[in-house]
UniProtKB/Swiss-Prot annotation:
It comes from Vibrio cholerae serotype O1 (strain ATCC 39315 / El Tor Inaba N16961). It is found in: Cell inner membrane. The gene is malG. PROSITE patterns: ABC_TM1. This is Maltose/maltodextrin transport system permease protein MalG. GO terms for biological process: maltodextrin transmembrane transport; maltose transport. The chain crosses the membrane at residues 13-35, 89-111, 124-143, 153-175, 205-227, 258-280. Residues 1-12, 112-123, 176-204, 281-296 are cytoplasmic. GO terms for molecular function: ABC-type maltose transporter activity. InterPro entries: BP-dep_ABC_trans_perm, MetI-like, MetI-like_sf. The lineage of its organism: Bacteria, Pseudomonadati, Pseudomonadota, Gammaproteobacteria, Vibrionales. Residues 85-281 form the ABC transmembrane type-1 domain. The keyword Secreted does not apply.
């Protein structure tokens, strides 16, 4: 006997679909506006979604190409956007790799080893992670100012110092990977030990291949967080050529003149490395899930 949908059920389905469309519009519309502003003539934040006279002026300036005006004058790129983009990718890439390495080894120790004070350390790490980095800006500046006197490449206005500062925020990632490790059956490592594998070999050859999905997630989250981070980077970096893109983009928005078009083009460029890394990591994520299912 065929089931007949009541009107109330249909209305709920329609309401759900309408809510989803509204939610998508709230997400997509601002992104489309940013793209539209980057193709408008002039530096105006308001205007139609589809520019009447599309222009590549802002994109050329963002890519480091001088623009020739109608009167014959030449407008040089105001800021080294591509240098900022490279700085962001370099800092985010190195930081993410180091965070994954440190978080993985630390999580393995907390998940598989027994030592005094383990629970206390875990809880303390989580409590300290709850405090925002903004509260420690003064301390960070004083710390890296002093550190730079002994280790110059870890001092102020260095990417090494910035990367080192980001490594202090791995507590959440340690907890995440630790939880994943605890879902993996210990019998796999015990079987490897019976075959003569050392704890390091069992960790590297058994546990890590099964943990590719969570490692990919941690890498993505770390990369996104570093690319978009502003307070610490703006504190430690003072040279314009050493800025990351998130910090450098603020140079377009000064009280005398808001360069919205140039800012929008730089904003779209800042999304490219995140998108590329996510797509690449997504491939590894799916591969890791499949491999883990077969080996398990």
């Amino acid at each position: 006997m065929a089931m007949v949908q009541g009107k109330s059920l249909k209305y709920r389905v329609w309401a759900t679909h309408a809510a989803l469309w509204v939610f998508l519009a709230l997400i997509i519309f601002p992104l489309l506006m940013i793209v539209a502003i980057s193709f408008r003539e002039g530096n105006f934040a308001t205007g139609s979604l589809i520019p009447d006279r599309p222009s590549l002026e802002h994109w050329k300036l963002a890519l480091g190409i001088a623009v020739q005006n109608a009167d014959g004058s030449v407008t040089p790129p105001p800021f080294p956007v591509m240098t900022w983009l490279w700085n962001s990718v370099k800092v985010a890439g190195i930081t993410s790799v180091l965070i994954v390495a440190l978080s993985t080894t630390s999580a393995y120790a907390f998940a598989r080893m027994r030592f005094k004070g383990k629970e206390t350390i875990l809880k303390a790490m989580m409590i300290f992670q709850m405090f925002p980095a903004v509260l420690a800006l003064v301390a960070l500046y004083a710390l890296f100012d002093k550190l730079g006197q002994y280790i110059p490449f870890l001092g102020l206005n260095t990417h090494g110092g910035l990367i080192f500062s980001y490594l202090g925020g791995i507590a959440l990632h340690v907890w995440t990977i630790k939880g994943y490790f605890e879902t993996i059956d210990r019998s796999l490592e015990e079987a490897a030990a019976l075959d003569g594998a050392t704890p390091w070999q069992a960790f590297r050859l058994v546990l890590l291949p099964l943990s590719v999905p969570i490692l990919a997630v941690v890498f993505i989250l770390s990369f996104i967080g570093v690319v978009g981070e502003v307070p610490v980077a703006s504190l430690l970096l003072s040279d314009v050529n050493s800025y990351t893109l998130a910090v450098g983009m603020q140079q377009y928005l000064y009280p005398q003149n808001y360069l919205w078009g140039d800012f929008a083009a730089a904003a779209v460029l800042s999304a490219l490395p995140i998108t590329i890394v996510f797509l690449l990591a997504q491939r590894w994520l799916v591969g890791g899930l499949t491999a883990g299912g077969v080996k398990g």
